């Protein structure tokens, strides 16, 4: 009897859109002949908060490592043990699993997900093109860029929007101060240090919203210090998915001043609940959801005044707020329903045998330094690097 094929999602175990993306695809899958696994990687050297919320997979595995000081080959050998040889698909969301599949044959097709309109993901696609069988992304902008970078692989590039739950309960109008929400990682690349300045600009023009910040991250303490003049900001920390979804019902506006994005999960989840987005005007995928002035606003990146002006306009014109609330919910419900979109992914997984390409004869690992050699014991590499770091 042949082994049952398995789809293995490998992803970083930290707060962010990648975790939510995988959660949605696992939660809404239908029986299809595959078993499903999640391998969550976490580098002890990262400053990000790990996630303890379970994923709805048949196998949910945590894989811990420390790079540096470990030998990358030793780390990859351990990672390979979490993905036994067999038929199916590896869904790669980060660099470490692509490094693994570049030198280790798992028997599975490798589908690489491009999560952002940024060099990090495009460079991964180009670097590992010989061992990636399918490139998947979810916005027109990112698909177009992949085709430009990989003109010989156009038939292997798939545009598959993902979806979110469309809740029955949506936000309801409430008189009083505007209820403004930020959801996501608290890190500089998300533009979170713009939030105190946006708030101060709003207060300068007589708008005093109620602020909620949901999430954690490496820059949380610094952000709290930068916003110390506002004692009533509600810091909700890192919550599980169900709590976050309920939170949307009690807010009016989602503020996302990101510097770079793909198509943020928080944007779709908030939009599905009727929370109006005020989000950086990034070409990556934001315009596919937010038509400025209709289903939200898209201020230019880093333009504090434009963000404040958009929020103030919604505060002063509650009729406009409600119209935009209905418009963004309609967009998300029509185009980004999780049940429909997950079925598209499952159909692609079902083609894994046809999409799987021959592996290169002499694969090479494109990571590491002189100490990262397969024949050097991990304990020796750790000792050398720890000694060097103390000098």
Model-assigned labels for residue ranges:
Residues 238-239, 246-251:
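Short alpha-helical donor nucleotide-sugar binding micro-motif in glycosyltransferases
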Residues 292-293, 297-304, 313-318:
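Conserved acidic donor-binding segment of nucleotide-sugar-dependent glycosyltransferases
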Residues 222-239:
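Nucleotide-activated donor-binding/catalytic signature segment of Leloir-type glycosyltransferases, i.e.
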Residues 19-24, 178, 182-201, 218-222, ...:
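A conserved mid-protein helix/loop that constitutes part of the nucleotide-sugar donor-binding site
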Residues 259:
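Aromatic "clamp/platform" in nucleotide-sugar-dependent glycosyltransferases that forms part
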Residues 276-280:
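Short hydrophobic beta-strand element within catalytic cores of glycosyltransferases
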Residues 91-97, 114:
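Short His-centered aromatic/hydrophobic patch
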Residues 131-169:
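Donor nucleotide-sugar binding/catalytic pocket of nucleotide-sugar-dependent glycosyltransferases
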């Amino acid at each position: 009897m042949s082994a049952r094929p398995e789809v293995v999602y490998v992803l970083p175990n930290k707060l962010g859109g990648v975790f939510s993306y995988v959660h949605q695809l696992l939660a809404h899958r239908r029986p299809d002949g595959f078993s499903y696994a999640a391998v969550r990687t976490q580098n002890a050297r990262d400053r990000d908060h790990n996630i303890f919320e379970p994923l709805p997979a048949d196998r949910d595995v945590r894989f811990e490592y420390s790079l540096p000081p470990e030998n990358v080959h030793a780390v990859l050998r351990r990672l390979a043990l979490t993905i036994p040889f067999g038929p199916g698909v590896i869904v790669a969301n980060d660099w470490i699993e692509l490094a693994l599949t570049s030198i280790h044959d798992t028997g599975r097709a490798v589908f690489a997900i491009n999560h952002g309109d940024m060099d990090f993901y495009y460079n991964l696609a180009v670097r590992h093109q010989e061992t990636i069988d399918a490139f998947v992304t979810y916005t027109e902008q990112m698909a177009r860029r992949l085709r430009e970078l990989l003109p010989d692989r156009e038939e292997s590039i798939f545009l598959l929007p993902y979806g979110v739950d469309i809740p029955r309960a949506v936000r309801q109008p409430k008189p009083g101060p505007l209820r403004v929400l930020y959801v996501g990682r608290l890190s500089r690349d998300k533009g979170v240090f713009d939030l105190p300045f946006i708030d101060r600009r709003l207060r300068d023009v007589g708008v005093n919203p109620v602020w909620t910040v949901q999430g954690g991250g490496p820059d949380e303490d610094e952000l709290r210090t930068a916003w110390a003049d506002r004692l009533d900001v509600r810091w909700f920390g890192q919550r599980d998915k169900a709590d976050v979804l309920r939170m949307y019902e009690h807010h009016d506006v989602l503020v996302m001043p990101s510097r770079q994005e793909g198509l943020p999960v928080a944007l779709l989840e908030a939009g599905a609940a009727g929370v109006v987005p005020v989000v950086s005007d990034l070409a990556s995928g934001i315009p596919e959801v937010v038509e400025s002035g209709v289903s939200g606003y898209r201020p230019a990146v880093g333009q504090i005044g434009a963000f404040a002006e958009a929020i103030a306009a919604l505060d002063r014109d509650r009729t406009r707020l409600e119209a935009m609330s209905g418009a963004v919910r309609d967009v998300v419900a029509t185009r980004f329903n999780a049940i429909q979109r997950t079925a598209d992914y499952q159909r692609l997984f079902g083609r894994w045998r046809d999409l799987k390409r021959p592996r290169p004869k002499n694969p090479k690992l494109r990571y590491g330094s002189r100490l990262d050699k397969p024949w050097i014991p991990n304990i020796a590499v750790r000792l050398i690097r720890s000694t060097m770091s103390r000098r």
